[in-house]
């Protein structure tokens, strides 16, 4: 899935996400910003997942939050991408937003938070690029995957990621990859953070 951004759409997307850093919102809407995907969270392909011997159907519920508050517009913008990624994972026999015959439920929550928040920084002591300076701001993202199968305890996995944005002559953020635009940055971040969470889930003995 790809979400295309003309300048007006970029403005609407920024408002929809409720970007945690107001400086980032201003940069994006100005149309002259550079966006970088943090390199601490790597790409994980579905081929690396540990596939269950007998995959079961699952209901997928996705929600995007901005600083812990439900963001309906951003949820709607990203839901298809996330559900399709789960469907292509090979971890389940069938994937739907409606209740599954097995009763299994996979909840995926993606929370956009300032990287200075305790909820973000305490869970990521190393890896992400801090020490921001000049016209550079960063948004943190926390992906929480919660898998619940009938008669079993929930299996929860949490992964963190970030998008860095610079404007003008600001130095390139270290350990990051430049995206061509905010569209590519957001879609790549979502794909990577969800992929890592699904990979962690697949290797948990409680899931398999």
Regions found by a protein language model. Give the residues of each.
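A short, structured loop/turn motif at beta-sheet edges
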Residues: 52-55, 98-108, 144-156
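A short, hydrophobic beta-strand-centered structural micro-motif
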Residues: 57-62, 98-116, 190
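C-terminal/domain-edge helix-coil "capping" segments
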Residues: 40-44, 138-142, 154-208
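A structural "domain/chain start" motif
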Residues: 32-91, 202-208
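Bacterial N-terminal signal peptides that target proteins for export
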Residues: 2-21
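Surface-exposed short loop/turn segments
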Residues: 109-154
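Compositionally biased, charge-rich terminal segments
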Residues: 19-22, 106-118, 165-167
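C-terminal motif of bacterial Sec signal peptides marking the signal peptidase cleavage site
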Residues: 27-31
């Amino acid at each position: 899935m790809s979400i295309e951004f003309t300048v007006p759409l970029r403005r609407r997307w920024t408002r929809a996400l409720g970007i945690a850093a107001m400086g980032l919102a201003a940069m994006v809407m100005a149309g002259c910003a550079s966006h970088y995907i943090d390199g601490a969270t790597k790409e994980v392909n579905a081929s690396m997942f540990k596939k269950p011997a007998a995959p079961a159907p699952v209901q997928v519920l996705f929600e995007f939050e901005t600083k812990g508050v439900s963001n309906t517009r951003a949820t709607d913008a990203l839901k298809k991408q996330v559900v399709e990624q789960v469907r292509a994972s090979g971890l389940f026999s069938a994937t739907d937003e409606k209740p599954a015959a097995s009763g299994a439920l996979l909840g995926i929550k993606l929370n956009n938070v300032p990287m200075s928040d305790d909820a973000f920084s305490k869970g990521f002591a190393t890896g992400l690029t801090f020490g921001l300076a000049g016209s550079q701001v960063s948004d943190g993202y926390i992906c929480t995957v919660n898998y619940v199968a009938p008669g079993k305890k929930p299996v929860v996995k949490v992964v963190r990621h970030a998008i860095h944005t610079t404007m003008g002559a600001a130095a390139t953020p270290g350990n990051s990859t430049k995206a061509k635009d905010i569209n590519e940055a957001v879609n790549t971040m979502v794909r990577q953070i969800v992929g890592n969470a699904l990979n962690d889930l697949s290797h948990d003995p409680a899931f398999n």
